[in-house]
């Protein structure tokens, strides 16, 4: 289990100067050729998403105005807050900020032949599945994960195991990404 606080994470500026990324975790850890990766991006200007052949990307808008996503001949989609949207990461996708507002989004990328991610918003206590990896990011409220208290802009990631996230207040929202390994693959095989 790895814990993080977005406000204390290192920031990597994009080469095109249109934004920055905070990497939460990769699996396998510290590998450039990852099977899955979670990150938070701040987007300051219109531009294209980086290409990652063989990967799927699920992007969830956390803050800022809506973002218009366009992939020629594939889709046009308006990304709205807290509504995950998946697309192939090997296609050119242009992002256009609405009203010029900066936005922040959560990204999870998975290698299509190894694993698949599902992203959802939780508003109550839940328990994860034991054989799956995952990432949580607190949008608001106070959540208990084991002996750790997680609040706004904090989270955790894990590569397997069963974990219970308890909402400690009457209301709260948490982004949860679950990683499902495809048949013939498991975290034990790749570490």
From Swiss-Prot:
Protein name: Protein Ves
InterPro entries: RmlC-like_jellyroll, RmlC_Cupin_sf, Uncharacterised_HutD/Ves, Uncharacterised_Ves
UniProt-listed Pfam families: HutD
Top-level taxon of origin: Bacteria
Signal peptide coordinates: none
Entry-linked NCBIfam families: PRK11396.1
Similarity annotation: Belongs to the Ves family.
Gene3D superfamilies: Jelly Rolls
């Amino acid at each position: 289990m790895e814990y993080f606080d977005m406000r204390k994470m290192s920031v990597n500026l994009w080469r095109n100067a249109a934004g920055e990324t905070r990497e939460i975790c990769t699996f396998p850890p510290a590998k450039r050729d990852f099977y899955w990766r979670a990150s938070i991006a701040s987007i300051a200007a219109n531009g294209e998403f980086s290409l990652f052949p063989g990967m799927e990307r699920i992007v969830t808008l956390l803050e800022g105005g809506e973002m218009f996503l366009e992939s020629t001949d594939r889709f046009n989609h308006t990304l709205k807050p807290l509504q995950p949207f998946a697309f192939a990461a090997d296609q050119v996708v242009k992002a256009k900020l609405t009203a010029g507002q900066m936005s922040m989004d959560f990204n999870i990328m998975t290698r299509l032949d190894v694993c698949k991610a599902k992203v959802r918003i939780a508003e109550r206590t839940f328990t994860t599945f034991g054989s799956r990896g995952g990432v949580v990011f607190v949008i608001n409220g106070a959540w208990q994960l084991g002996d750790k208290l997680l609040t706004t802009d904090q989270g955790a990631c894990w590569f397997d195991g069963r974990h219970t996230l308890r909402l400690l207040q009457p209301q709260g929202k948490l982004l949860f990404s679950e990683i499902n390994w495809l048949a013939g693959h498991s975290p034990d095989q790749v570490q």
